[in-house]
Amino acid sequence: MYRLIKQEGAARRGEFTTVHGTVQTPAFMNVATAGAIKGAVSAYDLKDLHCQVQLCNTYHLHLRPGDETVKKLGGIRTFTGWDGPVLTDSGGFQVFSLAKLRNIKEEGVTFASHIDGRRIFMGPEESMRIQSNLGSTIAMAFDECVENPAAYEYAKASCARTARWLERCKQEMARLNSREDAVNPHQLLFGINQGCTFEDLRIEHMKRIADMDLDGYAIGGLAVGEPTQEMYRIIEAVQPHMPKEKIRYLMGVGTPANILEGVRRGVDLFDCVMPSRNARHGHAFTWEGCRNLMNKKYELDEAPLDEDCQCPVCQKFTRAYIHHLFKAGEMLAMRLTVMHNLYFYNHLMEEIRQALDEGRYESFCQEHVEALGRRI
């Protein structure tokens, strides 16, 4: 469970203890959507990259290889070779973003698979059963992620439905955890705050789900096209109504600068595909900004990706070499840059935690937030 160690303004330094290990927070969760991080990075590499938590996706694993298959193979941690905590997303975001021909009812959602078009039904109970089969450390409640922008009345009705779905998720998880064949009988459940960019809906919904006494709480439905300042405004509105004794998770966020600002507003956990996705397109995160390795100026550059970085890649390889690998279409280019970016994000969190430990987080933010947002 969550323990608050120190606080500076709204920023929190803590630790989150689970059956699969203790997470030092604030922390970044490395995204392995289908059980692997894109870019040929395995669980074997993740310890060297200082990863604490891996995030896998319920929707994708349900479709392929199938959650029953993963259960037969010992659960997601045994299946992937990762022995630390794993969070599984509920599948809700993918149902509402990838799947076609959705039909939303009180029972749940019927949708067409983005792989083969077959019709699938998923509701709160189905999402919990799939995540129970996966045996993750943390399961996310099934919710509706409403498009942005959305009509106020639709967003209001969706919030109410998501809260009702959460009650069903909690009941089903209690039942599943009590089963003798549960992969992880200590599986935790996080609720998700929704409400688009409407402050009153966000606050009302957060108050309602806070009363359910869950293991943690997430802010969802942000970083989906709204201006960055809108996202910060919603976090500031919701944060005072989140239980102080529970861990807080901002879903799908974000850039290094977003993370600094999120921590400043009281967030403990983050996840984003950006470190691996940007790396696969030749973009390396550094303390000076995001470096585009496709640029010709790196053709003869013998410096590492980041001269202040201690990752395995920066200890051995040059910008010129990785630039060449991208131009030559070599897979190693993606692997090396993904490894660097994941290390950078995890090291950023280490620096954030140290700044909080030493009571200098605000000055740390002011020193780095502008540079981290640059493109170089």
Task: Give the ranges of each region predicted by the language model.
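C-terminal extensions of enzymes
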Residues: M1-T17, V23-A32, G39-A40, D143-P149, ...
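Non-catalytic, usually N-terminal nucleic-acid engagement modules in DNA/RNA processing proteins
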Residues: M1-V183, K296-E299
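Surface-exposed helix-capping loop/turn segments at secondary-structure junctions
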Residues: E172-A182, K246, I352-F364
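Conserved, mostly hydrophobic/aromatic
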Residues: G21, Q54, D89, Q131, ...
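Generic secondary-structure signature for well-ordered alpha-helical cores
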Residues: S136, E167, Q171-A174, P240-P243, ...
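Glycine- and acidic
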Residues: N148-A151, K156, G216-L222, M331-M334
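A non-catalytic, amphipathic alpha-helix used as a structural packing/dimerization or gating element
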Residues: E126, I130, L134, A157-R168, ...
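Glycine-rich phosphate/ribose-binding loops and adjacent secondary-structure elements
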Residues: A160-A163, E172, L176, N184, ...
